Design a protein with these regions (language model features):
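Phosphate-coordination/substrate-recognition cap region in phosphate-metabolizing enzymes
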Residues: 1-58
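Generic beta-sheet signal
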Residues: 2, 97-103
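Short beta-strand scaffold positions
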Residues: 6-7, 80, 102-103
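Active-site signature of alpha/beta-hydrolase-fold catalytic machinery across serine-
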Residues: 18, 110-114
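Acidic, low-complexity terminal tails and accessory targeting/binding regions
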Residues: 25, 36-48, 91, 95-97, ...
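Short glycine/proline- and acidic residue-enriched helix-loop micro-motifs
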Residues: 56-77
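Generic structural signal for well-ordered alpha-helical scaffold segments
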Residues: 79, 83-91, 112
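GST superfamily/GST-like fold recognition
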Residues: 105-109, 130
Length: 166
């Protein structure tokens, strides 16, 4: 890689440090890569959540919608944050750059949707340290005259790949 970014959260930044130690590249913290804020559920196991917030737990369990959880980051805000992260990474780099970013399993769904240019979130069990590898033409990303259906400009090389753990 030519550039390394990481969520500033401890576990992720430590993973980034370990994974890139041999390259000795600086790791740039990028706040927009942090995990989603689950509000009052933070730091609690499911039994504690159910005991302390039974109605919010029931609504979340039925809908899987974090907007029912007090103080949780709203879904719309997560989408905006993910789009901001993708747009920043694209705007700050050229096609010659190779970017490595370390993030979390919750926000990655929003990052993936933003990168794919879709409004729908796809459920995907993301493995710890799973790799997602994309090639994209950053210089033509925001141009309206770019052929969006041109498969050599945007390519998925790896998606949720944990084979390095085998």
């Amino acid at each position: 890689p030519t550039h390394v970014y990481s969520s500033p959260m401890i576990r992720t930044s430590e993973t980034a440090r370990i994974a890139t130690a041999a390259w000795n590249y600086p790791i740039t913290p990028l706040y927009d890569l942090i995990e989603i804020d689950v509000g009052v559920f933070s730091g609690k196991n499911w039994e504690e959540v159910q005991a302390q917030y039974p109605e919010a737990a029931r609504l979340y369990h039925e809908t899987r919608n974090w907007d029912h959880v007090p103080e949780a980051e709203p879904m719309a805000d997560r989408r905006v944050r993910a789009e901001r992260a993708i747009n920043q990474l694209i705007a700050d780099h050229t096609n010659e750059d190779k970017i490595l970013a370390f993030t979390h399993g919750g926000i990655i769904h929003y990052l993936f949707a933003a990168l794919m240019g879709v409004d729908r979130l796809w459920g995907m069990p993301v493995g710890n340290t799973a790799m997602f590898d994309f090639d994209l033409d950053v210089e033509r990303w925001h141009h309206n005259d770019s052929p969006l259906l041109h498969t050599t400009l945007w390519r998925i090389n790896r998606l949720n790949d944990s084979s390095h753990l085998d």
